[in-house]
Amino acid sequence: PSLTGIFMASELMATAVNAQLKRAGKDAAVGDPDSVIRVAIDGTPQGLQLIRDGALDATVSQPLSAYATKTAELIELVSKGGTIELGPKPDGQVIDTPVGPQYQLNATLVTKENVDAPGLWANQL
């Protein structure tokens, strides 16, 4: 079968994925027409370095400080009897799911074009 892309639920998987691609002879460099596209999620300093090194095409940045702040805000809201309203928010959106409301914070796709942007949380550490 033809493999064109891999999504990793964490950048921590990239080293193992890249090793298996090499073993299978599918380790063409990022950007090469024969390359398997590799995308992950987290946006950690290590993930950004993988992009700089050409070992990962992209990652979705999940700013830990924003997640922690929003979690604290929502805990305070709910503990005081408030409810989480569905709909668009300045920093994302709240959608309804079978298990309750889900707050989806805005996320940035990081590629070689913006990997060094100072606004990325991992570049601020």
PLM-predicted stretches and their roles:
Residues 42-43, 62, 109:
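Flexible, solvent-exposed loop/hinge segments that line or gate ligand/substrate-binding clefts
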Residues 35, 55-56, 106:
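A generic structural signal for alpha->beta connector loops
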Residues 69-125:
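Hinge/cleft segment of the Venus flytrap/periplasmic-binding protein
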Residues 1-50:
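Hydrophobic alpha-helical
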Residues 25-28, 54, 118-119, 123:
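Short glycine-centered helix-capping/turn motifs at secondary-structure transition points
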Residues 2-3, 27, 56-57, 85, ...:
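A general structural signal for well-ordered secondary-structure junctions
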Residues 5, 9-21, 52, 58, ...:
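Extracellular/periplasmic ligand-binding modules, especially the Venus flytrap/periplasmic-binding
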Residues 44, 65, 113-115:
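Short, solvent-exposed coil/turn elements at secondary-structure transition points
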